[in-house]
Amino acid sequence: MAKMLPPPSQSVPSRPPSWLYIPPRRRHGTFTSSCAFRLSPSSPSSPPPPVLDFQYIQFMDSWIEQTSLSLDLNVGLPSTARRSSAPAAPIKVLVEENFLSFKKDHEVEALEAELRRASEENKKLTEMLRAVVAKYTELQGQVNDMMSAAAAAAVNAGNHQSSTSEGGSVSPSRKRIRSVDSLDDAAHHRKPSPPFVAAAAAAAYASPDQMECTSAAAAAAAKRVVREDCKPKVSKRFVHADPSDLSLVVKDGYQWRKYGQKVTKDNPCPRAYFRCSFAPACPVKKKVQRSADDNTVLVATYEGEHNHAQPPHHDAGSKTAAAAKHSQHQPPPSAAAAVVRQQQEQAAAAGPSTEVAARKNLAEQMAATLTRDPGFKAALVTALSGRILELSPTKN
């Protein structure tokens, strides 16, 4: 009979006895619960295993059921009571904060977009202004160059006119071509008119495609305005004349110089071309032709307006034919008379102190004017020949 173990004490030990063997868990274990244990197998030499008491089995059950061995997944986390005790934020406050932040972000983006648009527009306006200033500077330089070229062309035209008057008359067709060229040059040499400036300013703020069309239209409008401004004033005068008179002279109080004659298609009578004797200072021209309907009527067409006063009648010079007939009573040419009168007025205004210098200048200018006048040469030759014939002794 097995030896009985002494009864256990009333207190439950804190740890199991050393003789209790708990095998490790195996893959195919031999126990299925915490209360099923087996003792180590006894060897033939070892004494038989002791008999387990029911109190130890209760001890093992209580030891295994301790809370420290719990398999709860919430180990170390705050309890539900503590989490529920914290005050939760109101839902209304959270919604308002989210909505206000979104609204503020939208306003900031709109302001940034507006600032970017304004900066781009300022850049475009700055570039346009710079382009307008550059074009204005370029046009100003071109105007200055054209004005200087026009002045030089006027001087050359005066010299060429004087040489032409000495060498002979020029055909009217060439004269008309030259006058048309001079009008074109004057149209190009004039400063830009206000419509052209306004059109250029409007084209500066247009798109590139519109700018080309606007510039072409502005150039055409400016050219049309310039041609209208440069177009001389035209007036006509009808004078009764003798049909047998072929001189085509219309006395209107001014001195004229004939530089050509031509027969037109619509009129069998020739047309005479005259220029004011003060040319090139005075741009007035005159065309005289008999009327195709009435041979007793002379039609005088004036182009331009005189920029000087009408000379007195007693200073009016005669033509070359009249000078040949009345050489001893030949008056000075109109240009020389005008120079003489101007110098006399200046000398009278300056006083006796400058009278000697004025007379010297007057003599030089009169000599230069008379030598350039072909009528003076013819009159001088006629006068000298007539005087020689008068002074020559007769055969009687």
Curated annotation (Swiss-Prot):
Keyword Protease in record: no
Record-linked InterPro entries: WRKY_dom (IPR003657), WRKY_dom_sf (IPR036576), WRKY_plant (IPR044810)
SUPFAM superfamilies: WRKY DNA-binding domain
Motif Nuclear localization signal in this chain: 222-229
Biased composition (Basic and acidic residues): 306-317
Cellular localisation: Nucleus
Disulfide links within the chain: none
Pfam family membership, one: WRKY
GO cellular component entries: nucleus
Coiled-coil intervals, chain numbering: 101-135
Protein name in the entry: WRKY transcription factor WRKY28
Gene behind this protein: WRKY28
